[in-house]
Amino acid sequence: LHKEYRRQRQMCIRDRVYWLRDRRYIMNLIVVPVAGVLTVLPLLVAGVPLEIAALVPVPVMALFFGWLPHNDVAYDSTALWTHVASGVRGIPDRLGRLVPVILVAVPVLAIAVPLTLLWIDDWRPLLPLTGLGASLLLSALGFSSIVSVIAPYAVSRPGDSPFQQPQRPTSRGAYGPAAAFLGAIVVSVPTIWLLVLTMLEGSQFAPATFWAGLATGIAVFAIGVGVGGRLSLI
């Protein structure tokens, strides 16, 4: 057990170094909050009330943060062989790749949620918004843990521009990301429905929305890490 923990810790540290030094990772981290905020503008232009439109960026950011590691293995580049030789496989490998994303996503979302509620001057959506964010983030991480094993695709090399993408001879670059992205949305539909009920019917549905989102996220995350870890051993 201690050996597995040490391997997981080593994997986590190496991934954190990549996230801090590799501009491909840094660009991803910058794009997520920006994309979340930009979703408000077209909604406001379309006439969506501010108190509704302002709730959209948090779930969007949670979903994209969870989706980021769906191709994490490909970003390893030549360092992958050092990783393979070290014997880090299975669940420690999966968790080690996801922890750096969680360490970034959780503080960002923890700041974004209260700022959103302060902006609209309404704290009633606190539990529903937190529950939906947890569902989307953890579910996307779970699906990404599987997709990164079964459907990796070519990415730009270390040092290349993040906007420079290589040719991809297969459809992995299409169905892999889509599976992780849409999968998280599908399993979060019950939580989304409860959030809508909370907004329409009142705060009596708020606790149910929070716990449903948290339970969904944890369950999909655990299953995804377990399945991804097992597949990485094959």
Label every PLM stretch briefly:
Residues 84-89:
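Short helix-to-coil transition segments within interhelical loops
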Residues 16, 20, 91-102:
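Interfacial transmembrane-helix starts/ends
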Residues 22, 29-32, 76, 83, ...:
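Generic beta-strand/beta-sheet core signal
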Residues 53-69, 73-79, 95-117, 122-218, ...:
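Membrane-spanning alpha-helical segments of multipass transporters and channels
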Residues 24-44, 55-62, 187, 191:
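Hydrophobic alpha-helical transmembrane segments of multi-pass membrane transport/permease proteins
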Residues 1, 220-234:
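Actinobacteria-biased recognition of intrinsically disordered, low-complexity terminal regions
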Residues 1-9, 13:
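Single conserved hydrophobic/aromatic residue that forms the stacking wall/gate
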